[in-house]
Amino acid sequence: MTRLVFCRKYQQEMEGLDFAPFPGAKGQEFFDNVSKQAWQEWLQHQTTLINEKRLNVFEPEAKKFLEEQREKFFNNDASVEKAEGWKPEA
């Protein structure tokens, strides 16, 4: 049976994640409030940001930047960073 959650990005009930994406309270929050579709879209966006901005994910500044961008992404904040020069496939 599919687990449904009220997705905070899409503001509707959608299929939930199969497991928390990371340990702790924040991981549980995403498990409870983010759809599988929204999480996959975030992973794609995060990968694009890492590649285009040449982020080293082991550096604290890069981790902080990605955490801030993740919150903006799931809150539909218009100030979420876009990778310059990147165009999604049509």
Curated annotation (Swiss-Prot):
InterPro entries: Fe_traffick_prot_YggX (IPR007457), Fe_traffick_prot_YggX_sf (IPR036766). The keyword Iron applies. Pfam families: Iron_traffic. Keywords: Iron. One of its GO terms (cellular component) is cytosol. GO terms for biological process: cellular response to oxidative stress. Gene3D superfamilies: Fe(II) trafficking protein YggX. One of its GO terms (molecular function) is iron ion binding. Could be a mediator in iron transactions between iron acquisition and iron-requiring processes, such as synthesis and/or repair of Fe-S clusters in biosynthetic enzymes. Belongs to the Fe(2+)-trafficking protein family. This is Probable Fe(2+)-trafficking protein. It comes from Acinetobacter baylyi (strain ATCC 33305 / BD413 / ADP1). The lineage of its organism: Bacteria, Pseudomonadati, Pseudomonadota, Gammaproteobacteria, Moraxellales.
